[in-house]
């Protein structure tokens, strides 16, 4: 079991590399992965069940202690990312299926790896976990409402169908995970240790399935979609950080806000696009999944160095006094 837990930690720490490698392989050899499309929704449900296994009441203590900070993060997330997505679709005159895909990923809750990036960045982990949990729990209502509001100009959107899908693939597995944790107690500890491995394998399969199903369209429009995805993610980080600065939050909390706003649950975006629209609509989510793990790792390294520099300046100032 220790070896499996160690493997799980290694795979979790190298998540971005696995997603990138298998996305490239799926693009070069789509026939190897084309049959995996039917696994997208069940695998996302498995990831959400794992999230439920790890959720604790303490994760929501930050909501009680600093409700306005959590509310600020949640509002920033559901305003900035959908808004930027809509503006990018207008600016680039994106085709309907791609536009819906970009808006869809923009309307998803915070990403599953944002907490890890916040920890690496020396951000406020409690705030990060609280924002991720609250945005995920609000997703069954807010995500379909925002998609309907922003994407209906391009393609027909059914609020109720999206609502039921998110309820089944996000909220229900999380609730089942929380119940399992309560009933089994310490017996789920070993399962929790291997969750990073299960999550990484699941997301990798989701990304490869989407890339394989849309290989021809990616070859045709991939550079345009990638440019939009990179801009979307970057504006999320930037506007999230400066929202924290505008409200005079400390550096650690500005980092948390940047990462929670900029990183999306792109697995959910891919699942919803595959189930309700077309394989092409899932491509922005798949590319977002690859890119935000790379950019998140780079940004967290930069943020950590900011803190180290701040620590050195504080120490020098104290020594001078």
Residue ranges and their predicted role:
Residues 1-321:
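Alpha-helical transmembrane segments of multi-pass small-molecule/ion transporters
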């Amino acid at each position: 079991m220790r070896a499996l837990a160690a493997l799980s930690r290694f795979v979790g720490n190298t998540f971005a590399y696995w997603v990138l490698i298998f996305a490239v392989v799926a693009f070069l050899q789509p026939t190897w992965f084309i049959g995996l499309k039917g696994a997208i929704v069940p695998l996302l449900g498995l990831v959400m069940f794992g999230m439920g296994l790890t959720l604790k009441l303490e994760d929501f203590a930050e909501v009680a202690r600093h409700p306005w900070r959590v509310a600020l993060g949640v509002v920033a997330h559901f305003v900035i990312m959908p808004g930027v997505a809509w503006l990018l679709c207008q600016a680039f005159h994106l085709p309907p299926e791609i536009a819906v895909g970009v808006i869809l990923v923009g309307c998803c809750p915070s990403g599953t790896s944002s907490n890890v990036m916040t920890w690496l960045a020396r951000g406020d982990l409690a705030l990060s976990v609280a924002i991720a949990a609250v945005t995920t729990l609000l997703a069954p209502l807010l995500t379909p409402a925002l998609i309907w509001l922003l994407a209906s100009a391009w393609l027909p959107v059914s609020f109720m169908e999206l609502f039921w899908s998110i309820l089944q693939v996000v909220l229900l597995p999380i609730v089942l995970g929380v119940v399992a944790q309560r009933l089994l107690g310490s017996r789920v500890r070993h399962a929790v240790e291997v969750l990073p491995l299960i999550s990484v394998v699941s997301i990798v399969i989701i990304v490869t399935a989407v890339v394989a199903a849309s290989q021809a369209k990616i070859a045709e429009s991939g550079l345009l979609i990638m440019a939009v995805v990179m801009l979307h993610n970057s504006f999320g980080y930037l506007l999230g950080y400066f929202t924290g600065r505008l409200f005079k939050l400390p550096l650690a909390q500005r980092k948390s806000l940047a990462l929670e706003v900029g990183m999306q649950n792109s697995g959910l975006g891919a699942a919803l696009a595959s189930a309700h629209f077309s394989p092409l609509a899932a491509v922005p989510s798949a590319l977002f999944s690859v890119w935000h793990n790379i950019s998140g790792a780079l940004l967290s390294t930069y943020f950590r160095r900011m803190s180290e520099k701040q620590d050195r300046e504080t120490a020098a100032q104290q020594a001078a006094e």
